[in-house]
Each structure stands twice: as structure tokens, then as C-alpha cells.
Amino acid sequence: MPELPEVETTRRGIAPHLEGQRVSRVVVRDRRLRWPIPEDLDVRLSGQRIVSVERRAKYLLINAEVGTLISHLGMSGNLRLVELGLPAAKHEHVDIELESGLMLRYTDPRRFGAMLWSLDPLNHELLLRLGPEPLTDLFDGERLFQLSRGRSMAVKPFIMDNAVVVGVGNIYATEALFAAGIDPRREAGGISRARYLKLAIEIKRVLAAAIEQGGTTLRDFIGGDGQPGYFQQELFVYGRGGQPCKVCGTELREVKLGQRASVYCPRCQR
């Protein structure tokens, strides 16, 4: 699943080619995504100029002169720019045609993504209750410490809760906990303020590094400019269960936490 760095990489890839451009037509070949694509999307968006492309959590907000297209990449979706008129292949569900001669093409084999329309996107039900962005000053270790008090759940699903902080998905939660030396199974409410301060720093560092390097390469992810990211080669623990820790050599263990695989080092993480 594309996580926050992958979505931000997509935003950075497509924004320069969309902002200031006028939409000439919207072609929808299959409306059956996680939520159906609005029947009148072509009418609403065609003829409008795209003002900006923003990101909130893992949602992309394509802001037109009136209204916003809210897009989510789901489990395996991607947005990329192609030449106008390029024939569509299987799973290529939407084309947003631009007067520049390019198209923004949405591909989603599993159809678990979304393309919705809103006149007030930040108050849309999907975005309204989201926590702060992890790379802003609204998120820090003190927030983690305060929200964790009395919580018996494991720390990993706690930091993956979008009401606590957005965009800390499985890959980056795993890596940040390793960098902070915290066992992902530990009870969230039992972790000290000092350790949460360290964890928040590592969450910011890991996410910023992934964004800077183009996002993590996953089998189904393609960046907005058609190029995959390349951060996976630097992962310390994610996807490496049973292999030696890159720091101490201890065999990494894999467990299930909240229905997700979690890899950790029993020596480096306490």
C-alpha cells in the first residue's frame, strides 16, 4: 500500500504538470472504486483550471477553481502523467485530460482507492477527524506521551492510529520504532516521555528521508513521474524477519500486531 512518503512523492511528481493547467475532459472507464466515482465528475471538473495539488495524510487534494478532487491510492493505485491519446490498458480507470497535451491517468488493479468531489475538502467526512501531519510542529513526542496515558494497546498500532498522527504506516512505524529502540509490542501507556520524544524525532526523520529519496519501492507503486522510489534498500527491519540485524547481528523476529506483520530486533529494541 502506498504510504505517506509515496503519496507525497506522487504529489511532487504531478503538481508541476497540473497547477495552472485547464482540464479539457475527464474520462471515467470504471466508477467502481472503494466509493463510486461521482457520475458528474466530468461536468464538475472539465473547463476548470487546477489551482494547486496538496496532500492531507494519504489523500491527494487536486484543487480546482471551484471544488476539489479528493484522491486516495488505496492498496495498489497510482497516478501518473502520460501523453494525451495513449491507449488505456487494463485497470486504468480514469483520465484527466489537460489542455497541455498531457493526461493524469489513475490506475488501480484492486479498485480500493477513491476519487471523490468536495466543495469543502478539509471538512469532508474522510478528512475531518484526522490527526496532525507528522512533519509539522503540531506533532511531537509530548503529544504521543499524553495521548498514550492509560492505553493498553501495543505502541506500534498506537502510532499508526490516524487520530494520533497521520501517515505513519506499517513500513515507517516499523523502521521508526527500531531507530528509537522501542519494542513494537510494548504497551503504549507504559512508555516514558523521554522515549516518546525520541520516537517522534525518529518518525519525522524516517518519513523525511523517504520523501527526500522518492518513497519506498513496492511492487505496485509507481511515482508520479513514472519512476519508482528507491528507499527500500535502506530499510533496517521491515520485511527482514529471520535475517540478521544490521546493527547487532541478532536474528530479527516477526510477529503479528493488529493483523499486520511487525519485525523487530529482540536485542536493540526494548
Curated annotation (Swiss-Prot):
Q: Do you know which SUPFAM superfamilies this protein is assigned to?
A: Glucocorticoid receptor-like (DNA-binding domain) (SSF57716), N-terminal domain of MutM-like DNA repair proteins (SSF81624), S13-like H2TH domain (SSF46946)
Entry cofactors: Zn(2+)
On cofactor binding, the record's note says: Binds 1 zinc ion per subunit.
Q: Which reaction does it catalyse?
A: Hydrolysis of DNA containing ring-opened 7-methylguanine residues, releasing 2,6-diamino-4-hydroxy-5-(N-methyl)formamidopyrimidine; 2'-deoxyribonucleotide-(2'-deoxyribose 5'-phosphate)-2'-deoxyribonucleotide-DNA = a 3'-end 2'-deoxyribonucleotide-(2,3-dehydro-2,3-deoxyribose 5'-phosphate)-DNA + a 5'-end 5'-phospho-2'-deoxyribonucleoside-DNA + H(+)
- Gene3D superfamilies, per the entry: 1.10.8.50, MutM-like, N-terminal
- What highest taxon heads this organism's lineage? Bacteria
Zinc finger region(s), FPG-type: 236-270
Instruction: Provide the active-site residues from the annotation.
Output: P2, E3, K58, R260
Example of a GO biological process term: base-excision repair
According to its UniProt entry, the function of this protein is described as: Involved in base excision repair of DNA damaged by oxidation or by mutagenic agents. Acts as a DNA glycosylase that recognizes and removes damaged bases. Has a preference for oxidized purines, such as 7,8-dihydro-8-oxoguanine (8-oxoG). Has AP (apurinic/apyrimidinic) lyase activity and introduces nicks in the DNA strand. Cleaves the DNA backbone by beta-delta elimination to generate a single-strand break at the site of the removed base with both 3'- and 5'-phosphates.
The record's HAMAP family line, in alphabetical order, gives:
Fapy_DNA_glycosyl
Protein name stated in the entry: Formamidopyrimidine-DNA glycosylase
According to its UniProt entry, this protein's organism is Pseudomonas putida (strain ATCC 47054 / DSM 6125 / CFBP 8728 / NCIMB 11950 / KT2440)
What does the organism's lineage look like at the top?
Bacteria, Pseudomonadati, Pseudomonadota, Gammaproteobacteria, Pseudomonadales
Originating gene = mutM
